[in-house]
Amino acid sequence: MIQDYLLYFSNNVYKDSLYIHLRRDYKIKDETRFFNDVEVLYRDGKAIVYMIHNISRYTKIWMDGYIYLPSKILIDVINSILINAGLETLAYKKNSGFVIGKIIAKTPYLTGFLYEIDLKDRIVHAYTDEEISVNKKVVVIEEGTSLDEKRYFLNYDLEGQKIDAYFISEKDLSISDLNKAIIIEQQADVGSDFFYLEEKR
């Protein structure tokens, strides 16, 4: 069962096809095979992408873009298609990796600001040149979370300071071109999943 994957759907790009990126390391395909409605792209003998064509035959997807926290119903539909094609299935996602945090400290650092962010059960550190007020709720990702098929966050050392979180902007989520941290204005629990919050609204 595949644990690490990222879904993408856009009628403008793939014309009624659901894209499932299976490997975090972006590589160019060297082989393609077809299994009924599923096109599989391979690199070095390993599947790197599933493309389910004619997805509207099976289910209706209303959103456009990356699906960071797919519903169990959608995964069940996808897995039914994959099983019929004789392919490995997807695990349910328990969370998206996009977490709501509360800024508890801000310190000028180098040319920007170092932030301490409370995620309920842990404190993480993020760096940006953007000034954000203490006590604001923001959206961050931690190590290993994918933004798209080519970009994912890894912890790094910034002149002696460990940076283990990254502020998410509207631009990161293709909501707008605004490259500023998303501020959560409505009531939201610190440590909760941003996309679960969106789904519950």
Predicted regions mapped to residue ranges:
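Phosphate-backbone binding interfaces of nucleic-acid-interacting proteins
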Residues: M1-R201
